[in-house]
UniProtKB/Swiss-Prot annotation:
Family per similarity comment: Belongs to the universal ribosomal protein uS8 family.
An annotated GO BP: translation
Record keywords, A-Z: Ribonucleoprotein, Ribosomal protein, RNA-binding, rRNA-binding
Keyword Cell membrane recorded: no
Family annotation (PANTHER family): 40S RIBOSOMAL PROTEIN S15A
Cited InterPro entries: Ribosomal_uS8 (IPR000630), Ribosomal_uS8_CS (IPR047863), Ribosomal_uS8_sf (IPR035987)
Xref: HAMAP family: Ribosomal_uS8_B
UniProt function note: One of the primary rRNA binding proteins, it binds directly to 16S rRNA central domain where it helps coordinate assembly of the platform of the 30S subunit.
Name assigned to this protein: Small ribosomal subunit protein uS8
Molecular function terms, GO-annotated: rRNA binding; structural constituent of ribosome
PROSITE patterns in the record: RIBOSOMAL_S8
Cited Gene3D superfamilies: 3.30.1370.30, 3.30.1490.10
UniProt entry tagged with the keyword Transmembrane: no
Length: 132
């Protein structure tokens, strides 16, 4: 059975594993998910990620990041643009998450960018998710 929204599936798996204090979470691999994982790592939300061959296809494994007392580094994740309702933002209207404390992930003509990177480049695009 095909998945209608693989990004929402990724974010839901990440949210559930984070809530349960798991150290890692695995999911089917795609280039888009790898780029999202790159952004999450560069912004300090996850410790790292790895791609491994599975019986069918490849598996993306994210290593979650916790503080010294096992407090979560990810407080919340929200999928914004969905297959049934796409959400786009112009370069002048790029949303800020929690006044700049969180990150908006955008799909632009320059690839996947954070809200700050997109504003700096002056490009808009589809708002995929908010992470804080």
């Amino acid at each position: 059975m095909t998945m209608t929204d693989p990004v929402a599936d990724m974010l839901t798996r990440l949210r559930n594993a984070n809530s349960a204090h798991h150290d890692t979470v695995s999911m089917p691999h795609s280039k888009l998910k790898s780029h999202i994982a790159d952004i999450l790592k560069s912004e300090g939300f996850i410790a790292g990620w790895d791609v491994a061959d599975a019986r069918v296809g490849q598996t993306l494994t994210l290593s979650l990041k916790f503080g010294p007392d096992r407090e979560r580094s990810i407080r919340g994740i929200k999928r914004v643009s969905k297959p049934g309702l796409r959400v786009y933002a112009k370069s002048a209207e790029i949303p800020q998450v929690l006044g700049g404390l969180g990150v908006a992930i955008l799909s632009t003509s320059s690839g996947l960018l954070t809200d700050r990177q997109a504003a700096k480049k002056g490009v808009g695009g589809e708002v995929l998710a908010y992470v804080w």
